[in-house]
Amino acid sequence: MREIVHLQTGQCGNQIGAAFWQTISGEHGLDASGVYNGTSELQLERMNVYFNEASGNKYVPRAVLVDLEPGTMDAVRAGPFGQLFRPDNFVFGQSGAGNNWAKGHYTEGAELVDQVLDVVRREAEGCDCLQGFQITHSLGGGTGAGMGTLLISKIREEFPDRMMATFSVVPSPKVSDTVVEPYNATLSVHQLVENSDETFCIDNEALYDICMRTLKLSNPSYGDLNHLVSAVMSGVTVSLRFPGQLNSDLRKLAVNMVPFPRLHFFMVGFAPLTSRGAHHFRAVSVPELTQQMFDPKNMMAASDFRNGRYLTCSAIFRGKVSMKEVEDQMRNVQNKNSSYFVEWIPNNVQTALCSIPPRGLKMSSTFVGNSTAIQELFKRIGEQFTAMFRRKAFLHWYTGEGMDEMEFTEAESNMNDLVSEYQQYQDAGVDEEEEEYEEEAPLEGEE
């Protein structure tokens, strides 16, 4: 029933993916080997969205793990939940892509892609009613970015009417892993604009900030960052995995969130976020969750939505929450901060409810927003891209793999178009009262 096939590519994608499976296995009452020992019927009811049932009460993730070098996969296999995955679903090369998008997309990755598609096909054929695909990857590297986007376009060709959701880790403004990130990211965005239905943008720097500022961790590890990402992924997919009063699936989310097909890049947030010692001192209530989830400091992508306006957004509440209270809070947010929502889409906040909270919490909320402020992120990458491309720096690594400079120029202009489309809709319909938007006031209820 409404299955999702999950792919994780590259080092970043595999690490986030592993954290995600760890989180949802826990929520569904599965232990590290996939055996069910939960307590609630509700955990089993929609288990098959993400898991295949094997013999002996064992559940196996419908996940395909892809990388161009064996290292990360070995780490996943040796990790706490390594025995969960089906061994045939590990597909890896030996050479690595070396942070080179062209290697992932055209040479090394292209050699491996048919093997991956065979596994994807096998998983898809086992589904009653395939809903779509989700892929975790980063946009700054070689495998996740290059091969990830190659897989997306191949899957798109073969399953044109299924949803394609991506959880994409975008390069951060200050924390850079490799010098060619702007190239890889721009080439990837060029692909995602055309081939993905919904892209959840996550960036490491915003995650670092959340870890340090809100969770009070002095030096956060990648494990801590991945934990945050998996909380969001779990929240976005919760209404697919558990029955709730107001359910949404990938397609409903897309219908509500994407006003124009190209503008499908979302900012995500999660609440409650409290430091490890402090959660005993806070009562979690719907108003509190709402305030925290609309707080720009809690966004997991480094762009401040106060510099733009929301086209649409979606709030997913979990736990024992009252429907009326949620509706009131949502109306409240829209009325008090109406300048942050475009006025030509009335009621542009969608809510979903699910009665099962995440482990260890009474209630939580996940936020997905389609804000025009995401253009900051693309602008920033575009500027870095242009700075290097103007000098043709590092280009030989890409042309050596058979790429053409023309492709870079196309990707650059596609990204610039995307930025100006966001800008155009941000300005739309406010011609008369242009002056009011000069000074940006902070959101109500936060200093």
Curated annotation (Swiss-Prot):
A GO MF label: GTP binding
Co-factor(s): Mg(2+)
Disordered: annotated segments: 424-447
Residues where GTP binds: 11, 69, 138, 142-144, 204, 226
Pfam families according to UniProt: Tubulin, Tubulin_C
Superkingdom, taxonomy of origin: Eukaryota
Acidic residues: compositionally biased ranges: 429-447
GO terms under biological process: microtubule cytoskeleton organization; mitotic cell cycle; response to antibiotic
Residue numbers binding Mg(2+): 69
SUPFAM superfamilies per the UniProt record, alphabetical: Tubulin C-terminal domain-like, Tubulin nucleotide-binding domain-like
UniProt-listed InterPro entries: Beta-tubulin_BS, Beta_tubulin, Tub_FtsZ_C, Tubulin, Tubulin/FtsZ-like_C, Tubulin/FtsZ_2-layer-sand-dom, Tubulin/FtsZ_GTPase_sf, Tubulin_C
Presence of the UniProt keyword GTP-binding in the record: yes
Recorded GO CC terms: cytoplasm; microtubule
Keywords carried by this UniProt record: Antibiotic resistance, Cytoplasm, Cytoskeleton, GTP-binding, Magnesium, Metal-binding, Microtubule, Nucleotide-binding
Substitution effect: residue 167 to Y: Causes resistance to the fungicide benomyl
UniProt-annotated location(s): Cytoplasm, Cytoskeleton
Assembly with partners or alone: Dimer of alpha and beta chains. A typical microtubule is a hollow water-filled tube with an outer diameter of 25 nm and an inner diameter of 15 nM. Alpha-beta heterodimers associate head-to-tail to form protofilaments running lengthwise along the microtubule wall with the beta-tubulin subunit facing the microtubule plus end conferring a structural polarity. Microtubules usually have 13 protofilaments but different protofilament numbers can be found in some organisms and specialized cells.
Function (record text): Tubulin is the major constituent of microtubules, a cylinder consisting of laterally associated linear protofilaments composed of alpha- and beta-tubulin heterodimers. Microtubules grow by the addition of GTP-tubulin dimers to the microtubule end, where a stabilizing cap forms. Below the cap, tubulin dimers are in GDP-bound state, owing to GTPase activity of alpha-tubulin.
Database matches in PANTHER family: TUBULIN
Family to which this protein belongs: Belongs to the tubulin family.
Protein name according to UniProt: Tubulin beta chain
Annotated organism of origin: Neurospora crassa (strain ATCC 24698 / 74-OR23-1A / CBS 708.71 / DSM 1257 / FGSC 987)
Lineage, top ranks: Eukaryota, Fungi, Dikarya, Ascomycota, Pezizomycotina
